[in-house]
Amino acid sequence: MKRAAQIAPIPTLALLPCALLTGFDAFDGASLNPSWLAVKAIDGELLVGHRIRVAQLPTAFDASLKELKHLLRLHKPTLVICVGQAGGRSALSLERVAININDASIADNAGAQPLDTPVVQGGPAAYFSTLPIKAMLIALLRAGMAAEVSQSAGTFVCNHVFYGLMHELSKKSIAADKKPARGGFVHVPFLPEQGAPSMHLNDMVAGLRLAVQTALLTV
């Protein structure tokens, strides 16, 4: 009698590796932040064998990195993409470099406005993204999406979080499989109701989804 073929068990979502995306809350008197609306739309999805987890960071220098460090310990992601809003831009901006400086032109949501202070005292002058930003750019452009590689993430909370993320990832492996986690930052434009230039939310969501897929597929 032939033995029945054994079917490999399907791993539960809890056992799958995690990709973490973060967005920010609204700031500077605004009622919304498209970065949060965009990442929230793909929470819980399964992409390239990874479960997508998302979280909102406060637009505050001190609290944002405290929350991010907690999320890294909690989820142990293999991929981290932090997302922020960049008014005045018309494309998804794949950030190349984070610099070790805080120089805020406005106060954050906690009332802090650091000027010419380091993100990490004694840290390197800069960290490069470890995301495959050129592969992500090509994929986005081929899909007909507005995208670019950006050479500056600014000097507000977005750059602060970007630098802090890369500093944490440089110290040790935080991923559940003990392999080095990759990370970086993406800026999204305004939504149409916020002003011009802008991008529709559906396009942001599709672009971020494709960016995550490309990052996970690119060695």
Residue ranges of model-derived segments:
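An accessory alpha-helical subdomain
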Residues: G183-E193
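Generic low-polarity alpha-helical segments
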Residues: F156-V157, A175
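Short active-site-adjacent structural elements
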Residues: G29, C158, P192-P197
